[in-house]
Amino acid sequence: MKISPFFIRKEEYMRFVHIGDVHFDVAFSTISSRADFGEERRLEQRRGFKQAIDFVKEHHVEYLFISGDLYEAENIRKSTIDFINNLFKEIPDTKIFIAPGNHDPKTKNSYYNNYNWVQNVTIFGEEVTKIEFDDVDIYGYGFEDFEMRDYQLNDIFVSNKMKNTILITHGDLYNNTIYNPISADVIKAKGFGYAAIAHIHKRDDYYPGSLVSLGFDEPGEHGFIYGELNNKQLKKEFIKVEQKEFVTEKVDVSSMASNEEVIEALNKIDTKNDFFEIYLVGYRDFEISINMRLIQKNIIKVKDKSKFKVDLTENDTTIRGIFIKLLNEKLKSGEITEERFQRILELGLTSLGK
């Protein structure tokens, strides 16, 4: 991971890395039924976090900001906390700040309150705290429960607007939710040189996005932000973390004649070592039943969105024709959904021998 300083002289700027939404020990159970998938992805979370810490160490970055949802409070294991803390020990000269989020609030019994973190770690609570250094003033606050609606940002007074100032918190910039709703306009009005925020897993001007993708709704590259701040002049860049990505593709089954052909087609897909979700589309006249054990490992989810092929003339008075006609009437009246229609149609025609 190579970088070039944006400013000419070191004394002109302060440097930081901003990480958000790691979600250590998240279950991943809704993504794939494969027993080993969750453990594999949790190992990737560890590798991704280590890449970020190695970057900090290699480039002697002075500040590390972790803007909440570092871990999943419901599932977190002490061994994972030990892993995190041991990595922090590798960067003793870096000042580390954590603003707990709605998934890892600083509750009475949390690891944030009941663990011997290394000395260079500061963990914010729900009250805004200001910490002053020669090169920057840092204002931070975080969750102490699974909800926060106190609008604490409005009450922050930036005392020295001529100095580098940074806000660290976990919150929602785009919706008036129970997860610390905050305003981009207020952030700008306060005069912060940088706002280290997390909560939204998609990267944009404020959010770094999740460090490692957590599912098919988070496609593309993931990583963290490296930044340099000098008297309100901000330079930043996205640093990609090497990981398997989540990819969604469609497979048209219209030209296929059997379930076995579908399985063969799935096994020919070049997954490039990424995780794939496949949508089966098109029209078919055979029943689909995919045994996940028969397809390549990196295809972790297959959804059948194909439709059963129906060839029916208006004067078809057979049991088959009457069945389809009645089913069509239920669909048109809104009594059943398209998905339900397709399922009943397939089961019915299979029973009738098509």
Residue ranges and their predicted role:
Residues I3-I81, L347, K354:
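N-terminal active-site segment of His-dependent metallophosphoesterases
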Residues F37-L43, D135-D145, K244-A257:
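Acidic/glycine-enriched edge-of-secondary-structure segments
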Residues E58-H60, N160-K161, I269-T271:
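Glycine-rich phosphate-binding loop signature in dinucleotide/nucleotide-binding domains
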Residues H60, D137, G191, K272-D274, ...:
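Short loop/turn motifs at secondary-structure junctions
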Residues Y63, E72-G223:
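His/Asp/Glu-rich metal-coordinating catalytic cores
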Residues A198-M256:
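A conserved active-site cap/scaffold subdomain adjacent to cofactor or substrate pockets
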Residues L234-K354:
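Accessory, non-catalytic peripheral segments of nucleic-acid enzymes
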